[in-house]
Amino acid sequence: MHRSASRLTRVLACAAVPVILTVAGCSSDSGKKSGTDSGKKSDASSSSQPSSKPSKEALEKAVYAALPEPCKAVGAKTIETIVPKAKDANGTAAKSNDLASRATCTWNGLDEAGLKGSQYRWLSISLVRYDSLASVGTGSKRAEDEYAKQVEKAKAVEGAENVKPEEAGGIGDQATSVTFTTKKDGDFFNTSVIARTHNVVITLDYNGTAYEGATAPDQAKLLQDAIAATKETVASVAAANEAKQPEQSAQPEQQPSPSNS
């Protein structure tokens, strides 16, 4: 009887082992499956969330969409003052395929004073406007790059002497003046003023010389006149775009198509 009870105990103990192992195995598999499912759900959840970073940065719209007529960038009174006896007071416009982006006008005049000699003046106003383009940047940034190039160009004129660049405050967003002298058929006193107003670059070149014993031009006065003309041109750029805005707003708004419902 004792042996039978002992044997029965051993049989029950052995029979219980597979049950425990089976339960443990199920628990282990269940945990792995749960973890896998959780990982999949996490991956799916993260992939479904929209990216907070835009694929392309929104470009800042160019401030100016137009240029003034180059030969009207400065007034008739200004031309009469700084280019006396101008050959054509209306100026000569350079050819351009796109006057809304690039325009130039020039004036020249010889003021003859008999025995006192003659004074010659030449003026050029060039305007370049840049749009914002995804491939190259904003209009203002493109204008900044062009402004820097024009300043360096003015400082590196072939044959220039006594080159003196200076920052010119109070003109647009950036401005630099460059004065220098050159020798052609006389001593020419040159002034270049390069200015940037938002996405437009203005390059104003102004020079003068004296003939037949006339007093040489005053370089300081040439610079003063050039700066004043550049400020006037900056104002003309702004005015040209203010005039354009009412035209755009006057266009009738497109009405939504009627609903089919």
Predicted feature locations:
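Hydrophobic beta-strand segments of well-ordered beta-sheets in folded domains
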Residues: 1, 50-52
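Secretory targeting and sorting signals
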Residues: 1-29
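Bacterial lipoprotein signal-peptidase II cleavage site
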Residues: 23-50
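A small/polar (G/S/T-enriched), proline-flanked helix-loop surface module common
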Residues: 31-35, 43, 54-261
